[in-house]
Amino acid sequence: LVHGAAHQIESCSKQTRHSPSNTDGTGITDESTLQVAIQASTMVTHQILEKLSISDLRGASTNAIVAHPKGIIQGVDQQHTGKIERVDERLLELLIGRDIIPVISPLGFDGEGKTFRVNSDAVALAVAKSLKAAKLIYITTQDGLVFNGQLIRQMAVNELDERLSSEESLFSPQSLSKAQHAAEACRWHVPRAHIINGCVAEGLLAEVFSNEGIGTLIYANKYQQIRPAKKRDISILLQMTRGSVANDELMKRTRAAIEKNI
């Protein structure tokens, strides 16, 4: 579980009357902004651990993101902004294997114990790639990807790439980051990436377990996901085709008939 902290950084900065140099981990992070980011991230991590406890779930804050300074870009020192070097996947797999949810903040660490501000969308992508995740789910405050006032329910990654190339200006800054990282995830063999509104009650359940979902699903080449059917799939196949059979769109087949053709 990867969380951001931009909103909390803005809130903490207002309380201290400090103007942050950057809030999302993509621009310059000066020393005072880094300290605010550490404070805000720690607060969010703690709140998540509290909520996990309410559901009788175990979680652990981690330093699994190994980073190094982003350095100088176009002559400008990015100071305490970091670039993700790698993910300590062994640590994450150890926790997950013991039913402990790794809670990962938008902070990276180097071998000298220095802390860097990193972008949470990039962290989530790096973790998904490292763990070879089946899904990457971005939870935001928007319904998903919207074009011409219409929510896009599903989109192949190649179509999204085309829109990012030709219509980047139509994306809001928040949507653009999610879309770019979702597309990269699919290119790196994460089969699906979701962008959903976290303000919708039980939205995550609806996205994962309903046919329609509530947000936008980005998927890799669907033909790469096809595999031969197995006998254990028969019940699912019968359930999937029930509606089409009732509408006379498909011929009714018995379990034995399907099994014979597998």
Q: PLM features: residue spans?
A:
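Conserved beta-hairpin
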Residues: 260-262
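Terminal amphipathic helices with adjacent charged low-complexity linkers/tails
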Residues: 7-9, 200-204, 210-213, 221
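Conserved N-terminal entry element of GNAT/NAT acetyltransferase domains
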Residues: 209-231
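Nucleotide/pyrophosphate-binding catalytic subdomain
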Residues: 1-195, 199, 227-236, 241-248, ...
